[in-house]
Each structure stands twice: as C-alpha cells, then as structure tokens.
C-alpha cells in the first residue's frame, strides 16, 4: 500500500473534486481501530463516486479537512449526526430508514400509545408517494402540515425517550421530505451505509490498521476501486492502472 499510495493521489483528489460539484451526495461514518486508538472512517459518495478517508475526529474537524468549502451544490443525505448539518450545502435529506427504526423502537417501548405509529404512517406515506410517482405540491403541503401537527403534540405523559426523539426530529424537520421535490434525492442513506460496511468487513478479516499512514493508503485505493466499479470498470484494472504508473 505504502509503495503505491503516492501514485493514487491524483485520482483520489479528482474523486474529491468531483464530489464538490455533485448535485447529490450521501455521507456516513464508522469507527476504525488504528493502532490501539479509535479513529473514524468517513464516506462521501453518490451513484458514480466514492471517497473514503479516516480521521481521529468524528466531528467538524474531520469534514473540514477534506471539504473546507462544504458541498455547496449538493443535497446531502445523512443520518442526524450534527456535524453534517454544520456543512455548507445546498440542502439536506435525512435518512428516513433511520427514523423508521427509531420509531419502531418507541412502538416496542410503549405499545399502548399511537404517536410513534402515526409518525411511521406519515413517513411511509411519503415514501409511497415517491414510489407511485403520485407527488403534487398540494400533497406535499398536506403531508408537512400533518407532520407539523404531530410534532406539536405534548408527549410529557410518555416515556422520556419519546420527547427525546421528538426534539431530535424538530431539529431536522425541514429536511424530512426534500426527496419529494427532487427526484434525484433518495429517501434513505443505504448506499453510504453499504459503503462503510465494506470497510468494517475488511477490518474484521484483517484486523486493525497498524498506522495512520496505512489507514490513509487503504482509503485512497479503496476509493479508486469503488469508483471504478460504479462506472462499470474492473476494480482490479483500476488498481493495476495506479500501480503501473
């Protein structure tokens, strides 16, 4: 890895630059052991590009090190990690799959209430509108009004987890239904989650990264290989082209 890492710099930087001008980008992060320390592998990706990097930070410092100007042309699809919402972006879309899982937990926590079930129904209705291609401005307005009313209900009579969840949703309420107005924006962040899962599998097979440099080198070559695959090319041939420079 170390021997060929420098040869990958140009291609790696080109991927990053193309993401800076992309209209839609998904992002996620996952823990990574480097030496004896906890670091974080970050992924920024879309249908054509994958950019992975590692950092000691799980916050804004890590993002700014690679995207100091943010992603001003992009709708950013993520979970609710606050660092993403401090970025300079065109718009946001919160991963609805995450929210559905959170709400299902509330259903199990208190089966006798119906607040979380109504939340799930609204989210699932929005997804069905997209799938059926049955979106109108009026339907979006009605959906947003129903969500606003639901989030305005008092939950103090329920377990504290309900109020905690509602407060979290209120912070991102403007980014629940972006995907209904922009057909290129997905309503989940599954692609980013799959991307970081591949890195987790690598660690389970081969163990931790021994050094910062090794983790960085892997991120470069992994980004190039994944981007090649997304564009219909061979991962092997992409890495071979880097090595043979």
Question: Where does each model-flagged region fall?
Answer:
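Catalytic center-proximal scaffold of phosphoryl-transfer enzymes
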Residues: 1-245
